[in-house]
């Protein structure tokens, strides 16, 4: 199956310039807005100096497409994590092509993802060292909270899909995908903005990373479904995602006093830029 991507550059890009890159992904039909879930704004990011790779993941494997039921399809797709491996392979090819244009700084790349795209983020952080920062609109497929947060019927459902939970061989099964099991090697700042209807599914990951001093931040949005629908929340997600990537990839902040508490937290995180390195969006130093 095929996949494709669009590379969006800043409107004032000139040949020879290199820009930090943000991946926006899951599906892309060529209408470049904010990716699946519409949470990471492509054109505003480009307008702030980012290269943005809008990536459309490949469809299911040939084995999965011959399935005659949803359960059979998902089990085939999950066998040896074949779907995750295929998506990662396609993403890496798209990134190679983007870097070959000469417009991307390969040492400053971030990834975002929502729903299945969040799982793509997980896999990429564990199985590659391509990215320096991540943003997720939902979190996370892992061993403990994910199968239990929605109750026993959901636990039975994910087991029927081929996942292993609370049984012999669980850790071996989850090793390539579990952020919990890979906390010692995943050292990337992670922003999570999720609805109150499903945030419990990632609490095991969030507690593990917080307890270990990793750079992680969770926002829970009230009265939200899987796809966020409230205009105020959608605007806040747009702004926070943009500022998160600017902070970690550009050493740049929004110097509006209303943002001071946000940047105080972020500056105290592991690996954060120092105050000497930070500049306001208008280019002014924070120092006198």
Task: Tell where the protein language model's regions lie, with residue ranges.
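Short, solvent-exposed loop/turn and secondary-structure capping segments
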Residues: 17-18, 32-37, 63-67, 123, ...
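Primarily recognizes the serine-hydrolase "nucleophile elbow" in alpha/beta-hydrolase
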Residues: 24-29, 93-149, 285-287
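Short beta-to-alpha linker loops that shape the active-site pocket of alpha/beta-hydrolase fold enzymes
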Residues: 56-60, 140, 222-224
């Amino acid at each position: 199956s095929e996949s494709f991507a669009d590379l969006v550059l800043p409107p004032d890009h000139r040949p020879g310039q290199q820009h930090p890159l943000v991946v926006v992904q899951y599906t892309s039909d060529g209408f470049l807005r904010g990716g699946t879930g519409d949470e990471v704004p492509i054109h505003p990011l480009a307008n702030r100096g980012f290269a943005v790779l809008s990536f459309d993941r490949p469809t299911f494997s040939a084995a999965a497409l011959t399935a005659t039921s949803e359960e059979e399809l998902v089990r085939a797709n999950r066998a040896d994590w074949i779907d995750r491996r295929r998506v990662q392979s396609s993403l890496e090819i798209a990134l190679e092509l983007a870097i070959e244009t000469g417009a991307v700084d390969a040492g400053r790349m971030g990834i975002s993802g929502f729903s299945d795209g969040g799982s793509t983020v997980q896999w990429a952080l564990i199985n590659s060292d391509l990215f320096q920062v991540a943003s997720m609109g939902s979190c996370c497929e892992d061993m403990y909270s994910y199968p239990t947060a929605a109750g026993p019927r959901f636990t039975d459902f994910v087991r029927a899909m081929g996942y292993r939970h609370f049984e012999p061989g669980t850790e071996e099964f989850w090793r390539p995908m579990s952020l919990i099991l890979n906390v010692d090697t995943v050292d990337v700042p992670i922003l999570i903005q999720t609805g109150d209807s499903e945030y419990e599914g990632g609490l095991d990951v969030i507690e593990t990373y917080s307890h270990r001093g990793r750079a992680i931040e969770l926002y829970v949005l009230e009265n939200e479904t899987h796809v966020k629908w409230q205009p105020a929340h959608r605007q806040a997600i747009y702004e926070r995602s943009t500022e998160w990537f600017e902070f970690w990839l550009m050493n740049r902040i929004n110097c509006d006093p209303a943002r001071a508490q946000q940047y105080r937290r972020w500056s105290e995180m592991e690996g954060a830029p120092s105050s000497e390195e930070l500049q306001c969006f208008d280019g002014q130093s924070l120092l006198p």
